[in-house]
Amino acid sequence: MAQSSRYSNERVEKILAEMVQVLEKNQTPTDLSLMVLGNMVTNLLNTSVAPAQRQAMARSFADALQASVRDDPSH
């Protein structure tokens, strides 16, 4: 999801690679990977975001996800 961030690309890519490695190690099919990642997002929103901000944060995340899928013709 292309977006300006306070985190370096290097840090983001390192964490992403580690998460992909876990999914590959478990031979996780795409649908299960999406379920797990979706549950992780839900858990983060419910445990780390104030209740009044959760819906807006979820919408922002969903919008960014949809934009990144539309904007990436390489996949």
Swiss-Prot record:
Superkingdom of origin organism: Bacteria
NCBIfam families reported in the protein's UniProt record: PRK13689.1
Database matches in InterPro entries: UPF0352, YejL_sf
HAMAP family assigned: UPF0352 (MF_00816)
Family: Belongs to the UPF0352 family.
Source organism of the structure: Erwinia tasmaniensis (strain DSM 17950 / CFBP 7177 / CIP 109463 / NCPPB 4357 / Et1/99)
Official protein name in the record: UPF0352 protein ETA_12580
A Pfam match: DUF1414
